[in-house]
């Protein structure tokens, strides 16, 4: 009887190991596919050489990307990190790119996307969402911003649109709880200076460390948001102000 029980347990354990191995393999295969897709998109994004334009203008060819998928509204880049991705927006379909890649195919990684409540041209605060993927992929890189030393070496965020290149400087990094915590995602526009200051003060209050940067009402913001796993429904948020 004991031998039978032992064999049953061994069969179950082997079965669990095989199933686990399959899912690990499947996950790694999916990661590799998505890495290849984004490497391909980066090649499309590389601007064609034009001697009449300066190097900064050549950095990202938004028109080429738009020709492939006209849902693109920008390109997000943080130097010396893995964050170098297109940013999509579908105002009529909420979270469309949550589980879709740049080519609108199913993807666990999804694609960074601009909140449907934002207007790429006029919003005071551009709120961009992205998945927290292991190995610092997608917005998983933001996890490093919990440490002040990392922030000091990666202060600036570049954001390209169809018409211009913008640069932002980080002013706060914090975590909160979705739905019951600080509702930062409701602030795509500010009705008045008091509302703006309330938002900024709350961001700084929650920030992992103090960043001594002046910011004035009317200055544009960008917000990067991803999941944060130290708490249920956690969110990790990076706020930056426009400097160029």
For every predicted segment, state its role.
Residues 17-244:
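Solvent-exposed, non-transmembrane regions of membrane-associated and secreted proteins
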